[in-house]
Amino acid sequence: MLSAVAIFGCGDNSSPNEGLTHSSEATEIEEKGGVNVITSTIISDPANDPYSVDNMSKAMRKQILAKSGVDSQEVEQLTLKPNYLYIRFLANGKQGLSELKAYDTSLVLFKHPLDYRPIRKPAVYIDPLLPDSIIPLFATVPVDYKFGPTKYEVLKELFLVEPLDGNCDDEDDCPDEADSTTAVNYLAKSAAEKSSETVIKKLSDMGVSLRDVEWESLSMTGNLDDRFVSQTLKPGESPVLGWSLFGSGKKLGGQLKFVDDELGVQPLVGVRVTGGYSYYWREAHTDKDGKFRIPEKWTFKIDFEANFDSDDFLLEDGHSWYGEDLEIEHNNFKSDWNETFTGDKAKWCVVWTAAYQYWYGDNFGLKRPRRNTWYNWSLDIEVYYKNKKDYKNLLPTSGPFIGCGAGESSGQYKSFAGLEEMCISTYGNSSRQIYSTTIHEIGHTSHYWNTSESLSDFFDLPYGFRNTYTRGLEYIFQKNRYGSVNLSYIKDYTGIIPDLMDDDSRTADGKKNIDRVKGFSMVDIEKAIFATKSLNEMKKYIKNNYPSGKSGRSYTHTDLDKLFDYWLNI
């Protein structure tokens, strides 16, 4: 563990490099329930870090000496200066996390430490010395980065060579000789310092690129195997050496899809995809076709990760003690990531698709659910996909509680310790049921945030009133996505909403031929529900505000009374 760190905030006048310390201890990594539990900010031995300033400087000197053939005292004095900082941000709760993301939307933030070696997933980071109110997040930033109000710690000074950007066209591969313009530009910017000017001159004079330096450092520290696939040589073949193994820089992306068991293959829309390795990461989001493109061009193999998170909600593993975020990895590739997810991962995608549509997609003009602001934080949606018992029960364990305590339902929205809790069970359920259930439960949080002062006020509303609204949401969303509706209607989950909308004289449960009401829009109905606190109040609101004969509506007060009486007395 670090024996001391420098903590900074916006008002701190200290240099961000003051108080910097390094640890020579590798972290102890525990495995609990298949989860990689990391307890230190520094994971692998810093002495073997290929991106440390010391090792990159040693590698640079070795390359210059190898090409000059002269053991120059002048060369031995050459030293690189850090161009990146490895940072731990200390966000003050979800409000602080929102503040950090709003300050710099380009930051690629991780909930676990970064390392020069691959990290086994799923991983969680636990620092018992931090108060529960603090959310630690890890990132790398340029050395001259202008920090915002979020407190932070400098964990390491680094010299990073990627990306290959300025010398390359967006669509074409970079030439083999292309150097990292980001790193070169940094050296040039600091060339006013005599040491930096000398470094640039020596590198230029000897024809040494920063890519050569990085190769040397990776080789010198024993990390080359993590960056390229070993060569398979035929008899008589000579091995390819140096940067030729990597070839040219390449822009990487791909297309992500999933299988809906009723609709077939569907695009995975809006998911955040990170791509990179070690300390250098970039991110993109999948478009309407599930396609994405990671910024910049890469000479090494990179790791991809699809993250089911957004500013307003995220999916987490309901079975885990640690509640780690759901994510899908595709590691160690220098090619596009094109994959169609099946099984449990496809079910995660269905939950995500429903939530993403309600928050950001076509929601038919309805009010959006809760948004992530300083007073309203993102919603964690617990997904239970391995078994039914963890969802059904609330199980005390040696650690925190796991389970939802949701009984035989498929989804649950409740107040837990004064906060919202949402659980979705995908185990044994069809894509349609998962999609519909997710819409139903998100509808509850939308109802709450658009109408109520507190969770207790919301849950004081009649149970049947709340679930009539969310059953109606299932009706319209399900009909739009699947072209048909497969729902049941009972006393607390009434069919009033489809009966107000359709022109079928039968009630939504098919039992009575009394429905003479038609033509209402879901937007009209939602306004009536959000303005009232019971089904009877909703009926009065409709009579007073939505006259028959306008906007396609057709009904008499008697017909409306008869329809509501049926569902209230079923």
Regions found by a protein language model. Give the residues of each.
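Bacterial Sec-dependent N-terminal signal peptides
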Residues: 3-32
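Pan-zinc metallopeptidase signature
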Residues: 44, 53-57, 71-77, 493-570
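Short, ordered, surface-exposed loop/turn motifs in non-cytosolic proteins
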Residues: 63, 251-279
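Short, acidic Ser/Thr/Gly-rich low-complexity loop/linker segments typical of extracellular
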Residues: 275-294
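Auxiliary, metal-adjacent structural segments of Zn-dependent hydrolase domains
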Residues: 349-420, 424-427
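Short pre-active-site segment immediately N-terminal to the catalytic Zn-binding motif
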Residues: 422-438, 461
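Active-site recognition of the HExxH zinc-binding catalytic motif
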Residues: 436-453, 467-471, 475
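Post-HExxH zinc-binding segment in Zn-dependent metallohydrolases
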Residues: 457-501
